[in-house]
Structures are given as structure tokens and as C-alpha cells.
């Protein structure tokens, strides 16, 4: 299943659905992760906070290809997208395993194919390097086989990268 997470605005959902099975709009109106770990222990893969991100773990966990469209913020995801990713920690379990000679959490949903990040907005070369490294590490942590990062000068280029 191909899933797109974005912060572009709700009006973009219809356009993005043409190239994805599932679209999640990170509008920034959700409570941040409280670090209670109930999504790991008490209610596996379901957030204890009952809002629209309650099932985010299951939606992102089912994605074979995950595309994240985000505005650059100092070489990182926008706050709304970061909040959504934080709330999806339940895609893994509290147990640990070695992957590639590194310790990582055991995956609840198994391996995935592509973690793609499409970044828009002003960005420096240093921020690009930070973003590439972070996306690669996020992909490994969440069990994706590979990662890609694309930087757009303006949003009119977006359609060709989905």
C-alpha cells in the first residue's frame, strides 16, 4: 500500500489520492506524543489519545511505500509532520533486535520498501545533508529497505515525484 503524509493543506488530499492508496494530512491540530508508551504496551499500535491520529501506527505500519511531503524547518520535518511521526512509534515494539549490526526496536508490521521524503521551502546545503541523514536513519528505524529525499524549488514540481 502506498501512503502519503503531507502538510500541504486539506485541499491537496484529492490530488494526492490519485497517486496513493492512503493520504494523511498533518494539519498540526493534534496533541503531541505524551511518551506514555501505551501504544507499545497496553494498546499495541493504537495511541491512547483518541483523536484523528489514534490509528496512525496502523496506517503507517501498513505502508509498503511511505511518501512524506514536508516543509523544511532547519533541516527537519515541519512540526505537524514531526508530531504525526512521533505519534506513530507503535509501529515498532518495545523489544530490541540487531539489524545491520545496530540495535533497533523489533518491527510490529515487518519490512517495507520505500521511505521517500519530498521537501519544499528554502533550504541550505547543510540542511539538505541533515535531512538526507535523518531520512536514512528514520527509514532504517521503521524497517524500510531504502530511502529517498527530493528537494523541490517550488511545489509545481511535486507531481513528477509522486
Language model regions located:
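Short, conserved loop/helix-junction motifs that constitute active-site signature segments
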Residues: 106-114
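N-terminal beta1-alpha1-beta2 submodule of the flavodoxin-like/Rossmannoid cofactor-binding fold
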Residues: 1-68, 74-93, 140, 158-160
